A protein has these predicted regions:
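Edge beta-strand at a domain terminus
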Residues: 1-9, 98, 118-153
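An ectodomain-focused feature that recognizes extracytoplasmic/extracellular
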Residues: 1-91
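Residues in flexible loops and secondary-structure boundaries
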Residues: 12, 63, 109-111, 143, ...
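A sequence-composition feature that detects small, non-aromatic residues
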Residues: 25, 31-34, 107-111, 125, ...
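Acidic, glycine-rich flexible loop segments
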Residues: 72-135
Length: 153
């Protein structure tokens, strides 16, 4: 569930739009995790939109996805969000102003994610228009390409 102002959007698991990805460490890269959540179309201030958030890989010292329960990560500035290439899509991809994401639980191949922050609602406005958002979602855990098929996604 995504809440922006009084508008609510539900997760969209179709077309592999939503997932919690865990990448195991290898000889060249440390372990990391990432989050993509697409939301079903809905009304937002008279427009039908299909918002999404992309949080790119976050390095971790954890060796299994289950160990990530309780993990948090924060971005405090637009510049940091731009550097990481994290974004929120409403009308167009925009960096986030700030956010905090937490892994609340991992159960039955799903991750319970909570993310709160401030997004850029309209990047064309001068100055841009900001708005708070809240996400509380269960999304599929993907550790390998085969997981998509196992989860029938």
């Amino acid at each position: 569930m995504l809440k922006i102002k009084d508008f609510i959007f539900q997760e969209d698991w179709g077309d592999r739009r939503s997932c919690f990805m865990f990448f195991k460490a290898d000889q060249e890269e440390s372990a990391s995790w990432a989050v993509d959540i697409g939301f079903k179309p809905g009304d937002f201030e008279g427009n039908e939109i299909s918002p999404s958030i992309c949080i790119n890989p976050i390095d971790t010292d954890k060796s299994t996805v289950k160990e990530l329960v309780g993990t948090t990560f924060s971005v405090k500035t637009v510049e940091e969000s731009e550097e990481r290439e994290d974004f929120f899509y409403i009308y167009e991809n925009e960096p986030l102003i700030e956010y905090r994401i937490e892994v609340l639980d991992i159960a039955e191949a799903k991750a319970h994610i909570k993310c709160n922050g401030v997004l850029i609602l309209d990047g064309y406005a001068e100055p841009w228009i900001e708005e708070k958002f809240e996400i509380d979602s269960w999304i599929p855990v993907i550790e390998s390409v085969q997981d998509w098929d196992k989860l029938a996604l």
